[in-house]
Amino acid sequence: MFKLLLVSPDKTSLSGLASALSGYGDVDLSWAEYGKEALDIASNNTIDLVITDEWIGDMTGLEFAERLLTVNPRISCASVSQLSPDEFHAASEGLGLMPQLPDQPGREDAEKLLQHLRSLKGLMGDMRVYDTTNK
C-alpha cells in the first residue's frame, strides 16, 4: 500500500489527480491544506509520496520540498509548477523531486507518478486501474 499526501488549500486543483489515484487499489490518499500541516503529518506518519500544488497557502511547493528534506529525506515529493522545464529543473535541483506536474494534473500524470514511485520502491507491479464506478 502506498501512502500519498496531497497538499493544496484548494482541493479542486488536484481533484483530477486525486480521482485517478483513488482508482488504484494500492493507494491510500490523505490531504493537507497547508505546508506546515503537511510537514507535521510527514514527521509523524509513514508517507511514500507528497504531491503539492504550486502554492500551498504558506509556502510554494518547491519551498515545501526543501523543508521536507529536513523532516524526512526518504519521502518522495512531486509539485505542480508553471515554470518552464528548464526553470523547474534549475529551481528544484538537489531537492530530489519527481517530474514536474502541470496545472490540473490528471490520470496520465497519476500513472506516471505511480510508475516512478513503484520504480523507486522496486515494486514494478500490476499497473491496472480498479474500476470503482461499476460495482
Go through each PLM region and give its residues.
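CheY-like receiver
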Residues: 121-135
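Acidic, metal-coordinating helix/loop segments flanking the phosphotransfer/catalytic sites
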Residues: 31-49
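Conserved phosphotransfer microenvironments
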Residues: 48-67, 85-88
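Conserved phosphotransfer cores of two-component systems
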Residues: 43-45, 67-75, 95
